[in-house]
Curated annotation (Swiss-Prot):
Motif interval(s): SxS motif essential for MIK2 binding: 51-53
Keywords assigned by UniProt, alphabetized: Apoplast, Cell membrane, Cleavage on pair of basic residues, Membrane, Secreted, Signal
Record organism: Arabidopsis thaliana (Mouse-ear cress)
Record-given protein name: Serine rich endogenous peptide 18
Single annotated GO MF: receptor serine/threonine kinase binding
Length: 80
């Protein structure tokens, strides 16, 4: 019984001292002008454009006009 009490006290002490050490070690957050915001990310996505991959078109119906892989069928994507 004595060993259990000593172990619980020791673990509690280590836990509490560890929590205070991590709180002291945190680096304060400083916002800089170089941080990317949602506007910059949206502009980059608009410049890049979509993919010609048949797997990148989303969850639409599989039988859309121009989405067939049959030779000679019209292709929907004309990107280089």
């Amino acid at each position: 019984m004595y060993n259990v009490v000593v172990c619980l006290l020791t673990l509690s002490f280590l836990l509490l001292t560890g929590l205070s050490n991590t709180a002291e070690a945190r680096v304060p957050y400083e916002a800089r002008e170089g941080v990317w915001d949602q506007k910059v990310i949206t502009e980059i996505k608009a410049e890049v454009g979509g993919s010609c991959s048949p797997h990148a078109h989303g969850r639409g119906p599989p039988n859309r006009p121009g989405s067939s892989n049959i030779p000679g069928s019209p292709k929907r994507c004309t990107k280089p």
